[in-house]
A protein has these predicted regions:
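Beta1-alpha1 glycine-rich phosphate/pyrophosphate-binding loop at the start
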Residues: 1-34, 121, 128-166
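FAD-binding core/adjacent interface of flavoenzyme oxidoreductases
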Residues: 34-122, 140, 145
Length: 166
């Protein structure tokens, strides 16, 4: 299990994934008559309190659905093709790695145009997560880059936050 409100901190190297991730089963250690099964639900028979799942039939007393979430690109194929979503720790680590790789490449590239492209970060979505990511990257730009990359001016990094609202 993970704590989604802090996933942006993982992406910006503010915290480690273990700070917001923990085994779901540990929440219920020592609980009697509690069983956790992760499966794909195929049918729900509420009158019989039975689920038909990818691992067979499961009876229940109380049923809690934790359906998760997916990134909505609102039909924007360009964003869908080029963006790095950030709904879970794995995606946040992918974003973190992409950022750090770009910083490393920017240090050694010979073209100023390429360097600027590597240091331009575009955040699509001005909701809570987008704003938090922009703020965390600003902190990274002002405090981490000068220490970890002293031979690369942090002023070269640009952060753009794009919102498609009305």
């Amino acid at each position: 299990h993970q704590f989604p409100p802090l996933i942006y901190q993982v992406a910006s190297a503010g915290i480690e994934p273990s700070s917001i991730s923990f085994p779901f089963r540990k929440l219920f250690h020592g609980r009697k008559d509690f069983y956790f099964r992760m499966a794909e639900v195929r049918s729900v028979f509420t009158d019989q309190k039975i689920l038909q799942t990818s691992i067979g039939k499961i009876s229940y007393d109380y049923l809690v659905f934790a359906a998760g979430t997916t990134t909505n690109f609102f039909g924007n194929k360009n964003v869908e093709e080029h963006a790095i979503p950030m709904k879970n720790v794995s995606e946040a680590m992918g974003l973190r790695n992409a950022l750090l790789e770009n910083f490393e490449r920017a240090l050694t590239c010979s073209s100023e145009t390429e360097r600027q492209e590597l240091l331009n970060v575009v955040i699509v979505g001005g909701g809570a997560t987008g704003v938090e990511v922009a703020g965390a990257l600003s902190e990274m730009k002002n405090h981490v880059l000068p220490k970890d990359y002293p031979d690369m001016p942090s002023s070269l990094m640009n952060i753009y936050l794009i919102e498609a609202g009305p």
